Amino acid sequence: MKNTFNTSNVFANAYSFWGYVIGFILSTSNRLYIGWFGILMFPLLVLATVAYIAAFIFAPPVDIDGIREPVAGALLYGNNIISGAVIPSSNAIGVHFYPVWEALGFDEWLYNGGTYQFVVLHFILGAGAYMGREWEFAFRLGMRPWIFVAFSAPLVAASAVFIVYPIGQGSFSDGMPLGISGTFNFMLVFQAEHNILMHPFHILGVAAVFGGSLFSAMHGSLVTSSLVAETAGDLSLNVGYNFGQEDETYSISAAHGYFGRLIFQYASFNNSRSLHFFLAAWPVIGIWFTALGVSTMAFNLNGLNFNQSIIDSSGHLINSWADIVNRADLGMEVMHERNAHNFPLDLA
């Protein structure tokens, strides 16, 4: 019997199969774009989410300070949604990479807070892949790349508190806990140890967040209030709007005229591109600065301080808000890790 096996057909089928797979991955017609970055993003974020939910519910107490006094963060150990958290890795681990195979067993890995590193590292890498996917999808559609630049702001902010700060402080136990009250605890301790409220870059971040909220509300309300009416007065404005139409749906000149007279002329934009660039750039740049500030304070380049009180020519103390802030910082610091050391560094 003649052998009819043909290797060229096998390679052709293989190429056609992989061509189909690659075409599906890179297709911009899918309901959910995948892309090369999506191959990384989807499994990483799924793993991070599943591990976070499981740890939040079931994880046993973690020896966060490395002094054999475990702290419980899971719901099954008496916490609620507010007090629960994924507790950071033990101070005994430091900044060592701590996958499960580095522990003697799974119980030891849980006791030392290995779940924190697992969730944080998978999440940061997954979020980075999401940012890359934003660029990739925009590239496929012929769009400009600024969407992924904007997303870099929350990504670098998360990286600052989850990665850079623990590295600078020498231990992942100093990272931000993955919970509501844990976040507040992190903020209070950060203020106590670094005086972040007096750091110029944090001030820029506050201006970015609150200013961005204000500008967003102003822009949305102005646009909604200056829609071009294409219908009779008894019909909704939406009836005269067709999705994808070339004509603008609102009058920027009317909005500009209104706001220019409400405040003053040059407080209002008359160019849509400049306006939307400003709306994107303001919060993004401010959050970049905050992330940079946290990253520098990670290495103890702290906010402005007033460690020496104000005194008059006779040597008498002149009470100021700086004294109150210092006392508040010391009070927060003595309550932080109160069993791990006898005195805070500022008092020792």
From Swiss-Prot:
Transmembrane segments: 33-50, 122-137, 146-160, 201-222, 278-292
Annotated positions binding pheophytin a: 130
Site note Stabilizes free radical intermediate, residues: 194
Subcellular location: Plastid, Chloroplast thylakoid membrane
UniProt-annotated binding residues for a quinone: 219, 268-269
Residues that coordinate or bind [CaMn4O5] cluster: 174, 193, 336-337, 346, 348
GO BP term, pick one: response to herbicide
Positions of the record's site feature: Tyrosine radical intermediate: 165
A molecular function (GO) term: oxidoreductase activity, acting on diphenols and related substances as donors, oxygen as acceptor
Assembly with partners or alone: PSII is composed of 1 copy each of membrane proteins PsbA, PsbB, PsbC, PsbD, PsbE, PsbF, PsbH, PsbI, PsbJ, PsbK, PsbL, PsbM, PsbT, PsbX, PsbY, PsbZ, Psb30/Ycf12, at least 3 peripheral proteins of the oxygen-evolving complex and a large number of cofactors. It forms dimeric complexes.
Protein name according to UniProt: Photosystem II protein D1
HAMAP family per the UniProt record, alphabetical: PSII_PsbA_D1
Cofactor comment text: The D1/D2 heterodimer binds P680, chlorophylls that are the primary electron donor of PSII, and subsequent electron acceptors. It shares a non-heme iron and each subunit binds pheophytin, quinone, additional chlorophylls, carotenoids and lipids. D1 provides most of the ligands for the Mn4-Ca-O5 cluster of the oxygen-evolving complex (OEC). There is also a Cl(-1) ion associated with D1 and D2, which is required for oxygen evolution. The PSII complex binds additional chlorophylls, carotenoids and specific lipids.
Miscellaneous: 2 of the reaction center chlorophylls (ChlD1 and ChlD2) are entirely coordinated by water. Herbicides such as atrazine, BNT, diuron or ioxynil bind in the Q(B) binding site and block subsequent electron transfer.
Family: Belongs to the reaction center PufL/M/PsbA/D family.
Role, per record: Photosystem II (PSII) is a light-driven water:plastoquinone oxidoreductase that uses light energy to abstract electrons from H(2)O, generating O(2) and a proton gradient subsequently used for ATP formation. It consists of a core antenna complex that captures photons, and an electron transfer chain that converts photonic excitation into a charge separation. The D1/D2 (PsbA/PsbD) reaction center heterodimer binds P680, the primary electron donor of PSII as well as several subsequent electron acceptors.
InterPro entries (alphabetical): D1/D2, Photo_II_D1/D2_sf, Photo_RC_L/M, Photo_RC_L/M_CS, PSII_D1
Topology in membrane: Multi-pass membrane protein
GO cellular component: chloroplast thylakoid membrane; photosystem II
PANTHER family for this protein: PHOTOSYSTEM II D2 PROTEIN, PHOTOSYSTEM II PROTEIN D1
Matches recorded under SUPFAM superfamilies: Bacterial photosystem II reaction centre, L and M subunits
